Structures are given as structure tokens and as C-alpha cells.
Amino acid sequence: MENKPPVINLPEKETVNTPQKGGKFTINDFEIGRPLGKGKFGSVYLARTKTGHFHVAIKVLFKSQLISGGVEHQLEREIEIQSHLNHPNIIKLYTYFWDAKKIYLVLEYAPGGEMYKQLTVSKRFSEPTAAKYMYEIADALSYCHRKNVIHRDIKPENLLIGSQGELKIGDFGWSVHAPSNKRQTMCGTMDYLPPEMVNGADHSDAVDLWAIGVLCYEFLVGKPPFEHEDQSKTYAAIKAARFTYPDSVKKGARDLIGRLLVVDPKARCTLEQVKEHYWIQGMMEAKIRAEKQQKIEKEASLRNH
């Protein structure tokens, strides 16, 4: 982002850097609606611009909490990365601004809400739904990796659902620009950590491949594959890629998950191979056929009335 302001020691005056439009905003330019979510450092609200009535989500973060939590540089990195990403399966960061006490991120609004809430209600997703989401997240991460961005914290809590039912990656707090492609920082969520992170070894963009393998399992089963009450048992299972499938997980899905949850990062299948996998392609074709049939039946029903 050009002319990117520092996150700390921001001026008292309300101002904004809007590379997309070059305009200036303050919180007074928005009508604030219902809360969409709450985090450790602030909350997210549905809002709309007073001019044009354009719906957005505004993440309101308290500077004092960011500083005391030592995450101001993480936020700066999140803004830098997300402002440069433009993909249908990634939440857009439109702009940001601040006042004396708060920082405001103006984000794309995802009316379908949070993925983990849908998963909690559904218990688990159908194969066609899980396959569709897997295709979308693989496409989004492929785009990120081409830009040397590693997400490092893929999990249902960081995913949202758009107006057409599409998956959207919504949180880039742990992501990094990694042109060198080697990192050693421990980050992310325990159940989704790959063996190389648990072992404290160098890691690359292959961490995201492991994470979507865990995600696919959780989509289909309702819980992650390495979940144990004892943290040491979770880590041991991750290091050995040791897990079992319930009978409900079919052969095709097992094949894909097994190609992603591989201890050796170099041996994991690529994101393009995920998109082209026979289980994903077959499930998506079946979903399209079912939707077409529903449309035909609905039109026939309307004609008969």
C-alpha cells in the first residue's frame, strides 16, 4: 500500500488513506448497524455509507489493546497484505482510517455470516458442499501463493460466506509476505498446525496445504482429525499424521485428505491438484446437476399454478 501510515503513534486528527478512491472518510460517514462479531481487540459491525448506502463491515480496533497485546505490527501487516488482494473468495479491504483511540477497517460484507457457525448448526457439510468450498479455498490460496502470501491460519473461524453461498477468506492476521518462502514463527491454531511448525522447523506455503486437508476433514466430520483433550497427544498425532476416518467419509474424500495431510511438506499435493481432484470435480458436477434439476422442477411448479 502506498503512503501506508504507521499503526502506532497515529495522529489525533481523523484521516484516511484510500488508495482505491483517494477520498477521505471518518466514522461519521457511516451508519453503524448491528454487531457481526467480537474479538480480543475490538468488534465488527454491519454498516453502510451515508452516501450511496453501500453495505460494508467495519472492524473497530482499540489502539490501547493492540499495543498492550503487542499485535500492532501484526495489524499493520494484515492491512498491507489484504489491501493488495483482489479475489472473489477473499474478503476485500476497501480502506481504513483512525481517530485518537481506534482504528477502523472497512471490509466487504459477507451476508452469509461465519463459516464455523454454519458448520456448528449443520454438524457437518454434505460432500457436494464440502467439495465446492474446497475448490474455492484452493483457488483463493493459489492466488495468494502466486503473490508470495502465506495465510498460515486457515480454519472455519476465519472463513465467511458470501451472498451467493461462496466461501471467502476473511482474516489475514497471521499471514505473511514471504518471497524467501521460509518462515520459523509458530502461529495459527493448534488443531491446524502442520508437523513442520510443531517441530519448530522452517516452513513454506505448504502449511496452507496441510491446513486445508484438516479443513476438508472438519467439513465432512464436524471436528478436526487430530483433536485430543491432551495437547501433547494432539502434537504427537500431528507429527505422525496419525488419524482415523469415520465410515461416513467416502473413498474420494479420503484420497484427497490423505494427499494433503502428509508429514513431508514437499510430498503434499498442490493447490492445482486439489482443484482438479476427481472427488472435487465429481461432486461439483453432481451439485450443478442437482441445482439445474431443482430449477426445472421449480419452473414446472410455477407453470402449473
Curated annotation (Swiss-Prot):
Stored PANTHER family: SERINE/THREONINE-PROTEIN KINASE IAL-RELATED
Disruption-associated phenotype: RNAi-mediated knockdown disrupts the localization of the condensin subunit smc-4 to mitotic chromosomes. RNAi-mediated knockdown causes failure in mitotic chromosome segregation and cytokinesis, leading to aneuploidy.
Example GO BP: positive regulation of mitotic sister chromatid separation
Main location: cytoplasm
Protein kinase domain: residues covered: 30-280
Location within or outside the cell: Cytoplasm, Cytoskeleton; Chromosome; Midbody; Cytoplasm, Cytoskeleton, Spindle
Name assigned to this protein: Aurora/IPL1-related protein kinase 2
GO cellular component labels: centrosome; chromosome passenger complex; condensed chromosome; condensed nuclear chromosome; cytoplasm; kinetochore; microtubule cytoskeleton; midbody
Effect of residue 168 to R: Reduced in vitro sumo-1 conjugation
Active-site residues, Swiss-Prot/TrEMBL: 153
UniProt keyword annotation of Lipid metabolism present: no
Annotated consequence of substituting residue 155 to R: Reduced in vitro sumo-1 conjugation
Assigned protein family: Belongs to the protein kinase superfamily. Ser/Thr protein kinase family. Aurora subfamily.
An MF annotation (GO) of this entry: ATPase binding
Key word Ribonucleoprotein present: no
Catalytic activity: L-seryl-[protein] + ATP = O-phospho-L-seryl-[protein] + ADP + H(+); L-threonyl-[protein] + ATP = O-phospho-L-threonyl-[protein] + ADP + H(+)
Record-listed E.C. numbers: 2.7.11.1
Keywords: ATP-binding, Cell cycle, Cell division, Chromatin regulator, Chromosome, Chromosome partition, Cytoplasm, Cytoskeleton, Developmental protein, Kinase, Meiosis, Mitosis, Nucleotide-binding, Phosphoprotein, Serine/threonine-protein kinase, Transferase
